Amino acid sequence: MQVNDGPSSHPIFVAPVNGNAQRSSGYVPGRIVPVRSPPPAKAPPPPPLKPPVPPPARPSVFNLSEDGNRREQAQNQQRKNTYICVGIFFGIFLLILILVLSLTSKDVLDENCPHQNPALRSWKPGHDLKKVVVIHSGEHYRLDSSATLYSITIQAGGSVVFADDKKGSKNITLRTRHILIEDGGALHIGAPKCRYRSLATITLVGRSDETAVTEVPGMGRKFLGVNSGGTLELHGSERMSWTFLTRTVPASGLATGDHAFQKNFSRGINLRVVDQDTAEVLVNERFDTHESQDDSKRLGELLKALPAGRIVALATGDSAVKNLVFETKQTIHDLLGSNYISDLKYRDAWALVSVIGGGNGSCTEDVREHENHDTGGKALARQDFFTVDGVGFTVTAYSEWSNGYPTTGFQVDAVDKVVLNLQDDVSSWNPGDRIVVASTDYSMYQAEEFTLLPCPNCNRKQVQIQGKPQFSHVGEILDGVDMRAEVALLSRNILIHGEMENSCYGGNWCQYFSYDTFGGHIKILGNFTSVHLSHIELKHMGQQREKGRYPLNFHRCGDVDQSGGYSNPAYVDSLSIHHSFSRCVTVHATNGLLVKDTVGYDTLGHCFFLKDGIEQRNIFFHNLGLLTRPGTILPTDRNDSMCTEITDRVYKGYIPIPANECKAVSSFWIAHPNNHLISNSAAGSQDAGIWYVFHNSSTGDSHGMISETKAELTPLGTFFNNRVHSNFKAGLFIDRKVKSTNATAADPREYLCLDNSARFRPHESSDPSRPRVAAIIDTLISFKNNDLGAWIRGGDIIIRNSGDGSYPKDEGSSQEVSQSLFIGESRNRGTNGGQNKYWGIGGVDGKMRTLPRNKTFPIRGFQINDGPVRIFDSTFRAFSPTADRFTMAVGFSLKNIWQLTPRNNLSALAFHPSVTLRAFFGRPGDWFEQNDLDGDKNSIFHDLDGSISGYADTYVARADNFLIRHPQCVDMPQWNGVVCSGKYSQVYIQTQAASNLSLSISRDEYPDKPMVLRGIRTKTSPSQQYQPVLMMGKSYTMHWNGPAPRETVLSLINFDQDDWALLGLCYPNETVFQITSDIYNKQNNGFEGIEDYGPVTSIADLEKRQQERKYFFDKSAGLLWLYARARHRRDGNSYCSSAGCERVKIIATIRANQKTETCNCTANAYPKYSKPASNIVPMPKPNTEPCGACGASQFAFSSDPWNSYLQTQIKSLSVKEEQDNDTQAYITVNAQRFDLSQSGFLLVTVDACSGKVTKNSMFSSLDTKMEQFFKTGIMKRSIVLLATRGQPASFAGVAQYLESLGSAKTPDLQNKVAIAFFGFLGQGGPSPQPWSTLLTCQGAKILGLQERFIPLSLEEYSCPPKKDSPTRMDLELLKKIS
């Protein structure tokens, strides 16, 4: 059916009809043609005059009276014309007045508002799911009411606009199977300068098994589609998209945990005593006052002993009055204000919540009489309180008889009381909105959704949530790393969603998903006229069974920025995409798209997804991806079961290997390095947070467009201030490619599965012959990733300002880490549950915490692999092993077969006292297995300055590696390591057709300590390679566990000019050799400088002529001796010389009768060639002075690096701690320490604007001086830090002064043994801050060291304006690359 209300000649709110080709340079999407007043109505002509009667003929004589008559007639006509003009004027005025009055003040015409275009006609199509609507050219409709239609097609010159008004009172829902915007058509909901205020919903309907529903070519079903030349402008109300917590929210909402109790037949009076400052249940007891007068008296005595202010909850169970003595009743009446206790009868249900000393005004109680084993409901008492930190909580007591069963219960909880403190102004978030709080633990499944409640007492940076959190969510910088949870708004006032079935059906992968995954989708095709989307919500979008059906898909759009001729480039801004069934935002063969402030939550498959490996210049700015689950579409989306069970695209019979080919689902899947990531957060994925993967050529629908992408050679785009956490495999992953060929018998793996053969090696202009370009990873925050914080492999890569082949692929490249902070076990201990499988003891503090794998999994701060890698100017904290687990600051890849270069170097490192294991080389056992693979044995690094080992310019290697030792080496038993001086390089020993052999290498100085290597390749490979690290200037023998290989190549790796090693290779004694040297040029894959080796007659002769190309074959020992000597210089990090890779090639001709001999010549070689052990480079003296310049220069690594944070620490001491010989009580401010050496109080104040310490004062007691200090001695806008030592006089008296410094109420400090207080005095007096907190302990408990990172110069502090505001580097970078 076609709807046509007739043509219109009014101005049209659409772009030029022919798409990109006809856009003017000044076209601004969302702007309508200026409103013009309608042309004035033509005035009706005056009534025709009667034809004049000719006067009678008379003489032409001048006559005065006749002339006067003519004047009078003329005046009459003029007056008549004047009346007519006045009438016309008032008519026009009346028309305008009617028009204006017909528009309320809220609808004053605004040229930026599409719904106010006078060309629009009201449209109310009604509800008919069979009605097919086509909007033709010249038809411009304003949808004024909800509608249900089969489909809408907006053709060239047609437009649809959703109605709106200033109050946002519209609530329009459009249900349809699809909306198709064709060339020249337009759909508008709001505009960038006229935000949509009402509620607009587009519901896309349909099932995947509706075969009668025809698919639209290129679009499919259940979609909103934009064809070439179409316009889509959707702009909801501006709202904060996502922000961070600024105060930790504990599980249950209460730091001490909630309390719930319910029991039948708990006879007597049940009691709970609750700390009014913390909500902790202090006493949990039952008193059988029915049976025992002693219990009754004990209850009375306990109540009398409680301090004033303590919360008490009482509830009867079964019967409570038979032996409830009068004195106890009187105590309950006097202390708790009960009015019912004296009149309780047998089996009455009674409940009370009150405050000691609060009298009747603080008492809430209820009683219900017992009759026929029933009380007709609960006796319920409930009161609300708040902690000293301002957290609301409820104490409930209840008692009931029902169906002959008595029930007693208590609850202490924060249900509907939890307030979230947030970093940004969220006054645009409203009650009823849905939000999600990200996990800050290992499991991404600890992300939690909440509904917002009204909160009249909240400030603009606070919201109150319904219910309570199940898990802890960190809201602060811990141990120097920003671990604040992301908090995202899911609700928007423009919603596009798929209408879903209640469960999975048909062929929608129901074996993997129990729910319907056939959602709606939005597809944008190339050469559109205008597409801008902002502040909209996409829910239940994407189709898991169908490729190319994503929540938002820019499909082969080409350049969508100014390079593509768009004066206003396309963008996606502040979208909420959640509960999606296939990705979040797909950028497919599209360049220059800006995606900012967008949330992708709970999706199947890669979330922010670059598809074909040719997408470039796209900008991802301040986006959030969390809870990214596996999907089925691509091998890289799949988990184990999907990988092995979906085999329709592998070669017949092949079963994929999940770890190698699948299991890569990521929140950000970046298929080409020339894209920009700034201030994004990947807060939970089944595999990786951000994965840079490489394509050899364009893939997918773009297959064949670009035969060679050179992605591995392309410089990295901007990477700044991104964060990755709660990901199972890795936070950041830069490695591997996807397979770009179909499955064959030769390679049965599926097209686009993972492939391990890529190495990122960026060069200028993607040309390997031009200089390398370092990839800069600037400001990476990584924490709580199960396996790896970051896995980065390839060319020159530099990581800075961050918190957590047979040859290397790119000659001369290296990876570098600087100005970074590594934390082993942070104070973020996590919450047991939420699919966290492991819960165990921490090594630093001995407290229970979540663990990444199990309790034995080794935790490594900086993991050395391959190389060369360099780390310097970095700090390590909290690496301490347990009895079950090794936790080390510096470690190595587990079960490593690969090479480790001695050029890996470390320097200027700082280790916090909480680091008790600086380095570890593994031991046989869990996770390390036998610890005997080639890479395990050759683990080594260069300690440049001794900051890790204490010996400058030394090498640290595994303790049992005697290829690198000398007698002066220093053993490090705890590390399973040894520290040695010397020069070290590698020889790669490559053999042909002998890959099943093991190689035994002995140094002549330690012949009884050989190293046995298996080789890095499989036993069925055509060649094998062994990669030992050798001390230069020493001699070695090499032996085989089988027949010697016919062809062996020795490659000199990391040799400096004139470095040498004397090598003796074992062969049968009748072997004939052809030995040559050459230089391998990797650039042209050729060999140069080929020279033959000649024989000499003795080892002594060989030693004299080591500069020459000579060899000696000792037939008696079976050893072929020759020098591996570098003749050319090596530059920088190059592993080969400047001339190329120097090699020695040995072709052995072995007699037929000796071809099966096992060539192990050890027995003949020694003691003949044994030598005394010695060092070439003397061991340095140990460092004696601490390195003051070592470590990272920053104290805090935050996700808002333009803001400054103050590191503050408070260590208070109780009397018991002093008795236990702890003598340290102090306050530190950015490492400036103020000691408290005697019993008393220490107060330090800091200017909250500059971070400068303004005062530090010690008081032995709360005397008049200290009181005066509290009253007048603290400057406005001051951070106030308070520590205590011992038990000074008037300890509890300090409480009265803390409320004015940020405490939510006057705390109870009676019986407390230590205090640590972080407070703030605002410009106008008390100004509680999210970081303000009071910590106390009593009895045998201790506070320990308390640390807070406090933000400086917040807007709330009312600091004076600065001359130079901090530079927002993220915005500067965005401006630069946009």
From Swiss-Prot:
Residues 1-77 are annotated as: Disordered. The chain crosses the membrane at residues 83-103. GO terms for molecular function: calcium ion binding; carbohydrate binding; hyalurononglucosaminidase activity. Glycans are attached at N171, N264, N360, N527, N639, N696, N742, N854, N905, N996, N1069, N1160, N1221. Residues 1-82 are cytoplasmic. PbH1 repeats lie at residues 672-694, 714-736. It is an enzyme of class 3 (hydrolase). Cell surface hyaluronidase that mediates the initial cleavage of extracellular high-molecular-weight hyaluronan into intermediate-size hyaluronan. Acts as a regulator of angiogenesis in embryos by mediating degradation of extracellular hyaluronan, thereby promoting VEGF signaling. Acts as a regulator of heart development during myocardial and endocardial morphogenesis: involved in the looping stage of heart morphogenesis. Stimulates migration of endocardial cells and increases both myocardial and endocardial fusion. This is Cell surface hyaluronidase.
